[in-house]
């Protein structure tokens, strides 16, 4: 945790926090035997006790300080006393369960073995080193772990690694001996992290084989206080660590007399205390190690760092009990072998002394080689100094490239110099360099500097991006630029010296050449010639060296300044760079003899950054390390070069800070003495160190520049050789081209000669050909002249023929036009005739319509008068007795009879007119058809006479039978004609019918089963048939009933079988002649409109309305196909309509009025008869009445109240059978062959009822009572010829038949009939072919009426 980036959490200043930490460390150094169990009598007395149990939890985030990913770990605020304190580590009694996984993709449990670590890692070797050092430093400070913000500031991958690497959180409890479980856990965690770091962080097999090998043994052995666990595994504390120089005097006095745990004397300033070697020896005496430990050997030489050999398994320490190898695989980096027992090894120096003092112990003969990752990342331990200068010792930074994360280091051969420059190459480079101009030299150096900067920037791309690192990058670039400028000046001066030496005026400059800083190295990696700045090498006397060392190292207080670090230095990233780039020194140069080292003594003090490249002197290993850096740069590996440049850039700021501290110390009273000591102890001045730094960079730059210039030289040589080759090729090409040109000239001469000969022969041939061509031309001209003459004659002949042909075409066109004109005139004449015909027809139609309108107006007025009278008659009927009712009935019958006579007369006159018009239109008909029509007319006249006689008899019978009926029933003729019956007792009316007359209720209602709210109406009807649907039959809707009407003795002016009475079929098809039949017609053929508004001219049938709306009088009166005679409304289309007709509930708009008929005596319906209400009708065409049903069994005129609302039921959908009145009323006997409507559909249809079969009341409901499907009775199919009129009354014998309609038919006499679902009195109904048959039917009807009256 950097002191600049993070302030103390308690709000204290840096110095106050430092004081607190030092006081806590002094308190912990006081011996407290009872706080820690003693496991051995050899435990030093100076070991401080374990901290109390209140130490924070081992996973407290404040205990860990891991840097983020990058090349430069975050600086740690070191505490000397806390770092070098050694405590007793309680060990677990069981097997060590810790095996560590760095694979963050796995969730490992405590004690699980690792199968392999192949996942990518985000933790570098530097992270683990910093974490271990931080843990060791903080273990003695119980208050240091209270900074919770620190744990949250750690990167996620560091926190995850700590959780994975410390599986002891739940396994250590308070039951463990001692009260320092947290401290013990922290020690174990630190040791595990160190072990993981030493094993390369990527090795899963055998990772825990050598981790704390004596952890399961009862007899525990610990390193000596001078060598901590971190130092045992190759770690040492920061070499430049120093205490604060501005601590107050009182604090320093309190620190006196307390020896440090590592055997060093208390670190005080020189001006406060001057102690010599005796005091230091006495203080270090009680901290002898409990057992001798072999010293860690130094790593391999720098030249072998990048390519470490395969690791050799080594035995473990003799004082520990290793675990069986069968249980755990061997470690790839085991501990070094123990030293021989007969030759005890002196105690190695501490990490501080290892970084500053010469090593007192010789390295083992066979040191184990580290992996490339460990050798490149781990700090050097106990580095032996070089003997180049007396009293000067230093360590070299490690320049090995770290191995890739997550991968095991591969076995590689020993490293050697990447490329060697022979003497010939050096001479060629020198000559080439001297031959370049000034601009070319500067360009070469600029290119080299740009390449180095580019590589350095690429290396920086993957490093940290914070502001501190950014400033560091800028400083490095500035330092590099300045160094290259200085090197260019050196190059220029060195080249000048070489040119002077080449002229023989001066000896050649020193150094290997050809550039300043060049070093010559042979193929084996040995430096054969140094650079031009290399100092003179000489041997030192061993005695003098020892004496100097003894004298220098006696004064321990001279180096007390190194124990206190300035906070400003600690808070910067530069303070740790020395550790980061330290490299272990190789064996001394071949020109020196390795001297035996004395026991560890203090080295002379060094300023910050002293243990770096700047103080290498003539060390051979350092020179080869620089060469290795250059070779790595040439291989695009700039890691080591980046470290070197960082130290060079840091050096400047370190010097500035040192100068600042020197200025602050000027006020001290012993400053002069201290300066004298430091000047005496400092082996090199700042200027010398700067010069050494320049020399170091010049060696690097020369190595790089040699390759650059050699490459340029080789390029130039290659270019020259290429140009020479091109020149030779060009010369060869020129010679070949000359030869080819000579040959071409000779060949051309030969060709020209041959060409001249050929030309002469060609001229002769052309002359001959020209003569022949002239002859051919003359012949062609003669032939063309003859051809032109022939063509002229042909053209003349063609013109003549074309003139003849054109004349013929003109004649044909004239004839065609004449023919077309005649056709057009004929067509015009026809159109004129047709137009006149249409005009005549239109005029007749208009006259007919005028007459019909006049007649309708008269009828409307008559209906109004009749309605008024009926209303008054109803009121009288309620009061009068049965006798008055009988009297009224007789009067009504007389009136109806007179009205029928008048109506027949009117109809006869109308029929005459219609027949005349039909005769005019049928002028072109065949004579045979006229004969047939005449025969049919004669036959119908005979039938009419018989019918009149029968009607007279039936009328008399009805009058006698009606006398016993108390209430008269209205004539059912109105049900088919749509007219309101006049009131009972009213006199015959001769006024014309009045349309839209309000309904007039009948004189009396049936006693039972009467349809509520309906009234019966009797009106005079025309003598032509009217459509009557069967009562109560829904499936036979819209089927007209053919009847003939007319009083006895009256005959129509024209026979009913004349063509004028031929009713139209669908789409205008006429009724074709058919054999006599009384059946109804079948439904219209497919594709025909069921609602065609067609009706025969002169037959008062209205056009058929669409089923979706209620017809109106205006539609019927002004329809283009409306009948000329008395208009008749549309037929009833369903059983619901039939029921409403029978019940008397009809509206003026539904049924067109006709002149009133004589009043017939009322008939009462049978008791118990089912009414014809809407609810009792069945079939698809049932129409529900919306009129409110009045109470049943209402008798008399009360059932026909004037206030009853009459609602015309609507048809819901078109019917599927018998939907259209394809036959006009009375068409059962009509002959239609000579009709103007054309031929119709000859398909027979089922008829209702057989002749003579009269079903009784309450027969089965299949067909309606009295209706059968056997052919021979009822209305015949449209288009079939009928010889005579037949009565339809014969086909209605039971319930559902409309007897009153029959009674008011062609016979002319008003018959009394029952309207409640059964047939009333007969009247003049039509017989099948004879009056006897019709008489039988009338008798049956009368018998049925009598039975019904008796039941009532």
From Swiss-Prot:
Superkingdom per UniProt: Eukaryota
Disulfide bridge positions per record: none
Protein family per UniProt: Belongs to the NST1 family.
Chief place where the protein resides: cytoplasm
Bias type Polar residues, positions: 1-12, 218-229, 1008-1020, 1173-1186, 1208-1219
Biased composition annotated in UniProt, kind: Basic and acidic residues: 531-541, 653-664, 681-693, 726-749, 759-880
Protein purpose: May act as a negative regulator of salt tolerance.
Sections of the chain in a coiled coil: 712-943
Protein name: Stress response protein NST1
Residue ranges, compositional bias (Basic residues): 16-25, 268-277
Residue ranges with Pro residues bias: 46-59, 287-300, 331-349, 1153-1164
Biased amino acid composition, Acidic residues: 242-254, 542-583, 665-680
Keywords: Coiled coil, Cytoplasm, Stress response
Biased composition regions of type Low complexity, renumbered to the chain: 26-45, 317-330, 368-388
A Pfam family hit: NST1
Region feature Disordered, mapped onto this chain: 1-66, 216-422, 503-522, 531-616, 651-693, 726-880, 978-1118, 1139-1275, 1307-1336
Protein location: Cytoplasm
Origin species: Cryptococcus neoformans var. neoformans serotype D (strain JEC21 / ATCC MYA-565)
GO cellular component terms, semicolon-separated: cytoplasm
InterPro entries, A to Z: NST1
